[in-house]
Regions:
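Detector for intrinsically disordered, low-structure N-terminal pre-sequences
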Residues: 1-7, 24
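Sec/Tat signal peptide C-region and signal peptidase I cleavage site
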Residues: 26-30
Length: 363
């Protein structure tokens, strides 16, 4: 699942159509059933957190927060900050010339006091951070940590963070759609001197949300439609025997859709990349998306030129509803492509957020 300040820019389809395990830190009751040409899917929200050895060593780091406002003049920024429902004390602090700066390009930067960051109201935080999210220079706001609202309580309950820190997380979280976003982990890390709590915060910050997805296979029913949907790209012969065996049992059966994915996705789903010293390959969302149907990953997709060539020669844009294996692009408000993913079914995608070893492959 992709969450960003953007929207789906386009869907393209391959013209072939005619890792160490992460730690599952929490789950929530299955609340979502989705039916369609893919069959009947049951979704269980889960969170994956990397093991401590792949986390950045941030226990002794003092983090700085600076907001950048490209496109703003002094007067327009003053007007904006005066219009986001700040308290008099917050407004005075953020408008203090001592916390303002300009870079060589004239972009205004503001260094907010951490007390101001922690005290923002949900309304002010959402409006202010939506503005910051318009620029990649504000990376934590442009691509914030996010979690579905129905998973937040379970995640914090299993986090082993103190009640005080849990309350701070709730205070700095802001809503966008059905997700909570958090951009202020650096402020939270600075607020505690407990090394153990810092490590737990780092694990939480690097946790990724996803779904465990089960397909209900009706007993004695026809599997032709399921084979047609999940068996694209010449995979019907692999999919049919498995589904056929499931439907011959007594009573409806459920199967993890991992078994229906190509080998690349099947062997990586809900795992973290292996760390290899000296390996500079950028195996990110684009590399993962373009290798979805490959048995042996093609590292030319880790380079922009290789990715562009593959899309230009082997994909076509489609305007209708996406189907299994279609490639989806997500853009920022400036039109810049910030993410890609592979459509599976029921508005679910297979993806990897970033190339880092702390980011798993998820649905």
């Amino acid at each position: 699942m992709v969450v960003s300040v953007g929207f789906v820019m386009g869907i393209i389809r391959s013209i072939g159509f005619a890792a160490g395990l992460g730690l599952l830190v929490c789950s929530a009751p299955a609340v979502d059933v989705r039916r369609g040409p893919w069959g009947e899917l049951e979704l269980l929200p889960v969170m994956l957190s990397p093991m401590n050895e792949v986390l950045p060593d941030g226990t002794a780091t003092v983090y700085a927060t600076e907001w950048y406002f490209p496109g703003h003049t002094t007067s327009s920024l003053v007007a904006f900050l005066s219009g986001v429902s700040l308290s008099a004390a917050q407004q005075a602090s953020l408008l203090d010339p001592e916390v303002w700066s300009r870079d060589a390009a004239g972009v205004i930067g503001v260094r907010p006091a951490e007390t101001v960051v922690l005290s923002l109201s949900p309304e002010s935080r959402a409006r202010l951070y939506a503005e910051l999210a318009g620029s990649p220079a504000n990376q934590r706001y442009y691509q914030p940590w996010s979690i579905r609202t129905n998973v937040m309580n379970a995640l914090l309950a299993g986090s082993e963070l103190t009640p005080e820190i849990q309350a701070q997380i709730r205070r700095v979280a802001y809503l966008r759609g059905d997700r909570y976003l958090v951009s202020d982990f650096p402020v939270l890390l600075n607020a505690t001197t407990d090394a153990g709590q810092k490590i737990r915060l780092l694990r939480l910050r690097n946790a990724s949300s996803g779904y465990d997805v089960q397909l209900r296979v009706p007993s004695g029913g026809s599997i032709d439609a399921l084979v047609a949907y999940w068996g694209v790209m010449g995979r019907e012969g692999r999919i049919r025997p498995y589904l056929d065996a499931m439907c011959r049992t007594t009573g409806d059966m459920q199967m993890d859709i991992t078994h229906l994915l190509p080998v690349f996705a099947r062997t990586r789903l809900n795992t973290f990349p292996k760390m290899v010293v000296g390996d500079a390959m950028v195996r990110d969302c684009h590399w993962s998306s373009l290798n979805f149907f490959n048995t042996v990953p093609d590292d030319t997709f880790a380079r922009l030129t290789g990715m562009q060539q593959e899309i230009r020669h082997n994909y076509v844009k489609i305007d209708g509803e996406p189907g299994f294996g279609d490639l989806m692009f997500f853009t920022g408000t400036d039109g810049h492509i910030i993410h890609s993913a592979v459509y599976l079914a029921a508005n679910l995608v297979f993806t990897k957020n970033g190339h880092e070893a702390t980011h798993p492959w998820v649905i």
